[in-house]
């Protein structure tokens, strides 16, 4: 198997591709996280046939990247840059994405969802770095 992205085990739709392309998580890190967390499989299932050392190095990088992302979110909350309104919007977005990402959706519907995500993320980002007088 060439890649997890070609696997029938993953509903690798346009939305997942969009999110992965814009995330701080690499494709390899995503594959590790997905196979371990979602599929419940480890090194023996590695679709890239990586060496054991390379697999566990990538696993460590994945953990470190996820920790950094979580600390970044907590930092933004701590300085009130990510306020309750933004967190509420993100929670709603998370709930919708978790439903949509597990379905087979056509490109037109995916494009609509992606447009909404882009708009909300752009607005939240703008609000986070807005100059307050």
Task: Tell me the role of every PLM-derived stretch.
Residues 7-22:
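Short, Lys/Arg-enriched N-terminal segment that forms or immediately precedes the first helix
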Residues 28-36:
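Short alpha-helical "packing" element that flanks the helix-turn-helix/winged-helix DNA-binding module
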Residues 63-70, 74:
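C-terminal flanking helix
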Residues 72-104:
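Intrinsically disordered, low-complexity basic tails/linkers immediately adjacent to helix-turn-helix/homeobox/MYB/SANT
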Residues 39-51:
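Helix-turn-helix DNA-binding module
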């Amino acid at each position: 198997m060439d890649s997890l992205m070609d696997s029938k085990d993953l509903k690798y739709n346009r939305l997942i591709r969009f999110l992965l392309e814009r995330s701080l998580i690499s494709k390899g890190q995503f594959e590790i996280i997905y196979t371990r967390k979602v599929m419940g499989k480890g090194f023996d299932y590695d679709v890239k046939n990586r060496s054991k050392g390379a697999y566990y190095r990538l696993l460590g990088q994945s953990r470190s990247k996820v920790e950094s992302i979580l600390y970044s979110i907590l930092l933004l909350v701590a300085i009130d840059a990510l306020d309750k309104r933004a967190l509420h919007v993100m929670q709603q977005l998370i709930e919708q994405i978790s439903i949509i990402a597990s379905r087979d959706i056509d490109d037109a519907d995916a494009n609509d969802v992606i447009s909404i995500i882009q708009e909300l993320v752009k607005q939240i980002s703008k609000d986070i770095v807005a100059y307050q007088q």
